[in-house]
């Protein structure tokens, strides 16, 4: 059974792969909880986003993220390492405005594609939840410049971030899991030398476990520009709300969520679907 499930996950990753973790798909907001030491969490999904906007390239259109993937490794009872990103972005171009960077697109092109940027992060659980107090954690990492800015989708910049994680469970058997993030991201301004924008990152989320097989999940997640006006191109305020579900079956967790953009620089709406597999213990962490 284990080998067949692992094979299924491999097919999903190769066919649909690379939030976005002990992050709970379909949410972006990070949970405080850590996966067990020596285990690996594998996530794969697809996003369909309408009305995506790219202020640096001047493109707008409908974006398909094929392969929204995450690999999380439990290193100790309170430390987790994460790799996440997007294997390929496909943009159906609806309009083209002035571009702040040279684009390698034909004048009449109606589509573009590019690899997404990958993120490396470490999550540390600092305090376990008590009857009266929440659990606390810290997550920090770096976004790598894997995309090609000339394709008009990614920005090909190196960005750093860190956030405080808070979580509290309520109800019988802790069936309502609430958690939130508040942090800072240092975003390189892609069109200005020696310039950055320090944006505030935030997220508030909840997962309600209806029964052993079914949960309802929702969140609001985004970043807030701290500069006058809209901030440097490519670093504007963005936010979205997600509402969806998780379904557990055959050792996997399937998910689906609707997405609604909340700022002028965010996609209008969309959906995400995906699957998560938690392996048994596959290695013994160093002590």
Q: Can you say where each PLM-predicted feature lies in the sequence?
A:
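Bacterial N-terminal signal peptides that target proteins for export
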Residues: 1-8
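N-terminal signal peptide c-region/cleavage motif recognized by signal peptidases
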Residues: 17-19
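Transmembrane beta-barrel domains of Gram-negative outer membranes and organellar outer membranes
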Residues: 22-287
């Amino acid at each position: 059974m284990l080998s067949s499930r692992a094979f299924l996950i491999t097919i999903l990753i190769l066919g649909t792969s690379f939030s976005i973790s002990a992050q709970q798909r379909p949410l972006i907001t990070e949970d405080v909880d850590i996966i067990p030491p020596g285990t690996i969490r594998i996530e794969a999904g697809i996003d369909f986003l309408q009305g995506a906007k790219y202020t640096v390239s001047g493109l707008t259109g409908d974006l398909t993220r094929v392969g929204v993937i995450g690999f999380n490794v439990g290193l100790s009872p309170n430390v987790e390492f994460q790799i996440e990103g997007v294997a390929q972005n496909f943009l159906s171009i609806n309009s083209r405005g002035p571009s702040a960077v040279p684009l390698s697109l034909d004048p009449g092109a109606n589509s573009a594609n590019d690899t997404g940027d990958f993120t490396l992060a470490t999550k540390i659980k600092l305090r376990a939840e008590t009857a009266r107090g929440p659990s606390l954690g810290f997550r920090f990492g770096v976004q790598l410049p894997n995309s090609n800015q000339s394709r008009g989708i990614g920005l090909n910049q190196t960005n750093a971030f860190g956030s405080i994680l808070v979580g509290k469970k309520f109800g019988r058997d802790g069936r309502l899991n609430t958690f939130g993030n508040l942090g800072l991201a240092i975003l390189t301004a892609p069109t200005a030398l020696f310039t950055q924008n320090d944006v505030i990152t935030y997220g508030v989320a909840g997962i309600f476990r209806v029964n052993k097989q079914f949960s309802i999940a929702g969140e609001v997640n985004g970043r807030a520009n701290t500069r006058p006006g809209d901030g440097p191109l490519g670093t504007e305020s963005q936010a979205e709300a997600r509402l969806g579900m998780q379904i557990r079956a055959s050792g996997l967790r399937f998910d689906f969520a609707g997405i609604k953009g909340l700022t002028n620089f965010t996609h209008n709406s969309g959906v995400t679907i995906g699957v998560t597999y938690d392996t048994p213990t596959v290695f013994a962490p160093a002590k």
